[in-house]
Amino acid sequence: MEAQGAAARPVMNRWWVVVGALIIQISLGAVYIWSVFQTPLKGVFQAWTETQVTLPAQIVLAAFALAVIFGGRFQDRFGPRIVATIGGLILGGGMILACFTGRFSAGAALVWLIITYAVLGGLGIGAAYVCPIATCVKWFPDKRGLITGLAVAGFGAGAFFFAPLAKAFVSGGYYQLLGANLFTLPKLGVFNTFLALGLIFLVAIVIGAQLLRNPPAGYKPKGWDPPQPAVGGPARVDFTPRQMLATPQFWLLWITYFAGCTAGLQVIMKASPVWQSFAIAPLTPPIQADTFGAIAAAGAMAVAVLAIFNSAGRIVWGKISDNLGRKTALIVMFLLCGVAMLALNSFRAYGLYLVGICAVGLCFGGYLALYPAVVADFYGTKHLGFNYGWMFTAYGAGGIVGPFLAAWLMRVHAEVPYLSTDAAGQAVEKLFTVGNYQLAFVTAGIMCLVAAVLTFLLKAPRPPRAAAV
């Protein structure tokens, strides 16, 4: 047993909750692989513009963030297991229904993909996402920064496993991790890939959800005593959502979280097409099928490597924040992310490109780990699911604005023809839009630098009037 005090019945080993959290979050983290689907979908629906093909990625993140509010509220009320299970069923069902997208014309297909992949998928992700985070924080008050990092690390790692899986399913061939050919997979095409992934997500999330349960009332880890507030400092109380929203600190945190998510999600959702633009721009058209395939594979690999740093950042920055403080860690992250975004457009060599996007991914992962911990530090854990749901709307706003900025501020450099093969194995010529993303990168970089300044001004909130003594 790992508890003392209030629990009269045996207490489960709290690390089983972490196992369930990782299973769920790895599956949910596949939301970050959209850039792998982008080029194949444009190849099928050539009438889609850059903004249109980005739209499902924006909407899935917005639906995700909005659903976190209600998911947090429901898990506070009904417990994490049932809410996470329902989320897995909705996400898996939405992905399975998305496989019918190819049966529609271009306009109707976009609407169908938005309804199934984006809206249903986002609602399912949001319902399940907050459950493992809130549960882990309650089981690990002694390691709050580290454990929130672990709880969301799987979310960042999801793309590492599922980006190359989606790439292999779409085009057939080897499933590759870090350049190693592990096994071969049949060619399913982009639409049947939605079906396969939907089934995987549904089963995995439902299984992981069964490991989630809240600790008994009054639980605290063996040998741990809660730290006492500093003399003259804010008391440690639990804010209701209404009380939290009334504090200026909430809105300052929201703005900075929004800035970090705008930069991070801009890179994550565009990592593959941005690299393809960098690689194709200096080549002489038409691009041969094998050359284009190698460039696309490198783009998928960039998504996977980015996912490693996204995931690692959640653990690394969580641990750092436990030692140095949340505020110091956030300031360093915003500065690093801002500088990386400002320099990213000049990183045209593949190795440099990986360095740039991985720096952004490392910081973005840290935001996802530290903001739940900050909300718990500032506003208590009693209403953490609901409170963090409101904070998480900043992520949804960043998920809309980041990819939108990349599409809206992109300047078309060229329309380059490349060779591909159709379902019958015949060579066909398609067009790839080579874009310049400098304005989008610079805008997001400046936002991060401003966020660093705002974070420097941050102070803990005073307790609400009803709780003040």
For each feature predicted by the language model, list its residue ranges.
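Extracytoplasmic gate region of multi-pass secondary transporters
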Residues: 34-39, 163, 242-319, 402-407, ...
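Intracellular juxtamembrane helix-capping segments at the cytosolic ends
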Residues: 41, 126-140, 147-148, 366-379
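Central cavity-lining transmembrane alpha-helices of secondary-active solute carriers
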Residues: 55-73, 304-317
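Hydrophobic core of transmembrane alpha-helices in multi-pass small-molecule transporters
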Residues: 94, 108-127, 352-366
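Helix-loop-helix hairpin linking two adjacent transmembrane segments in secondary transporters
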Residues: 155-217
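C-terminal membrane-cytosol helix-exit motif in multi-pass small-molecule transporters
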Residues: 198-230, 452-459
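C-terminal transmembrane helical hairpin of 12-TM major facilitator-type secondary transporters
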Residues: 257, 263-266, 297-374
